[in-house]
A protein has these predicted regions:
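Histidine-rich, glycine-flanked metal-binding segment
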Residues: 1-25
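Di-metal (Zn2+ and/or Mg2+/Mn2+) metal-binding site signature of metallo-dependent hydrolases
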Residues: 20-44
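Active-site neighborhood of phospho(di)ester-bond hydrolases with catalytic His/Asp-centered motifs
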Residues: 23-30, 57-60, 88, 123, ...
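Domain-start "cap" segments at the beginnings of catalytic or binding domains
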Residues: 31, 44, 75, 185-186
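Acidic-and-aromatic substrate-binding clefts and catalytic sites of carbohydrate-active enzymes
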Residues: 36-38, 63-65, 201-202
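Divalent-metal coordination cores built from histidine and acidic residues
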Residues: 41-150, 215
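Histidine/acidic residue-rich metal-binding segments in metalloenzymes
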Residues: 104-124, 130-196, 200-222
């Protein structure tokens, strides 16, 4: 796509958009489709009219109930939709070692999913104490993602100081749990990206408005 003089011979396909507006679609960088209580196709139908053309989903809710079969279902059910659905593979199933879940996914269970073209990395590392402590099983999951050059999402509300240093050093590249500008700025200064969340359960946009100024803006995403 471009502006200027082009000939139809240069294009595989052309469309006359005279009198229309053209703008890029929104990409939601962190979402749990299951929380909407909709199947992927119905979620796409609801989100597209509002300008969202792609999402990066973490299916840890269905994975905590159905295990690998739940992840497989989400990948299959999102195939060929007009809204592109990328996925992060859940890192914490169960969410914590104290939980009783419908499944337990180890590194060898999630490793095959990294070969899928719409899988972008490892989902939010909620067990931040395990990450900071160098837990062997979690370390193996993070290493698998890093070896493939894939992203590792974070989830560490109110974590600060040396504990945050250890969490970031474990390989966690971002966080969407910041509820104050000070909390978010510490993460950015220490190398993470911050997802500014304005969702159904948590609305942090107002508190994080200072991040829209340089030098912080380039390290932020809206989700």
């Amino acid at each position: 796509a471009g502006t200027g003089d082009y000939s139809e011979e240069d294009a595989d396909d052309t469309e006359d958009i005279s009198g229309k507006y053209l703008c890029p679609g929104f990409i939601d960088g962190h979402i749990h489709i299951e929380s909407s209580m909709l199947l992927p196709a119905e979620f796409a139908r609801a989100a597209l009219p509002h300008g969202t053309t792609a999402v990066v989903a973490d299916p840890h809710e269905i994975a905590n109930v159905c295990g690998s079969r739940g992840i497989e279902f989400m990948l299959e059910a999102s195939e060929g939709l007009p809204l592109t659905m990328y996925f992060m593979i859940p890192s914490c199933v169960p969410s914590t070692e104290f939980d009783e879940a419908g499944a337990c996914l180890e590194a060898e269970d999630i490793r095959p999913f990294y070969d899928h073209p719409r899988v972008l990395g490892l989902g939010e590392v909620m067990s931040y104490h395990a990450a900071a402590a160098g837990d062997r099983k979690l370390r193996e999951k993070i290493d698998d993602a890093e070896k493939r050059g894939l992203a590792v999402n974070g989830h560490a509300p109110l974590l600060s100081g040396r504990m945050l240093d250890r969490y970031i050093a474990a390989g966690v590249g971002d966080d969407h749990e910041c509820s104050s500008a000070e909390e978010a700025m510490e993460r950015i200064r220490k190398g993470q990206r911050v997802m500014i969340r304005q969702g159904t359960a948590a609305r942090n946009l107002k508190e994080l408005l200072p991040l829209f100024e340089e030098p912080f803006a380039g390290r932020c995403l809206l989700v």
